[in-house]
């Protein structure tokens, strides 16, 4: 058995002219980074995954997101798209059939599924 512990960072829209948060109701939070570690059955780290994601919906980093994460627009501007990073993340996760996904809280799972759905990507392995 393997465990994959992952964490997502996501961005949201911000209108500088109006100085307020704006969002796309289909995808209010856009994933801009996926980080993960893979553990064996004895909880030893056996692999890591980390990738920024180039924003397609909210191209500028929301001021609050930047303050909380330290991520700047320059960090993500040349990153691969979400579909590309998601494909690589699925490969990272899917090395064994009995892999357990672990995450801090339910927010990351909800937003991962919402981003997958927004881009119409397959979520079953």
Which residues does each predicted region cover?
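Conserved non-catalytic scaffold segment of RNase H-like nuclease domains
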Residues: 2-109
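Substrate-recognition/cap helix-loop segment adjacent to the acidic, metal-dependent catalytic center
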Residues: 107-125
């Amino acid at each position: 058995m393997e465990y994959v512990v992952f964490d997502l960072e996501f961005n949201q829209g911000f209108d500088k002219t109006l100085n307020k948060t704006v969002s796309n109701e289909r995808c209010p939070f856009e994933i801009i980074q996926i980080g993960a570690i893979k553990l064996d059955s004895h909880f030893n780290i056996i692999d890591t995954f980390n990738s920024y994601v180039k924003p397609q919906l909210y191209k500028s980093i929301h001021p609050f997101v930047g303050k909380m994460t330290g991520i700047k627009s320059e960090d993500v501007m040349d990153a691969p798209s979400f579909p590309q990073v998601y494909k690589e993340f699925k490969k990272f996760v899917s090395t064994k059939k009995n892999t357990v996904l672990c995450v801090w809280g339910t927010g990351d799972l909800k937003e991962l599924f919402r981003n997958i759905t927004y881009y119409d990507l397959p979520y079953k392995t």
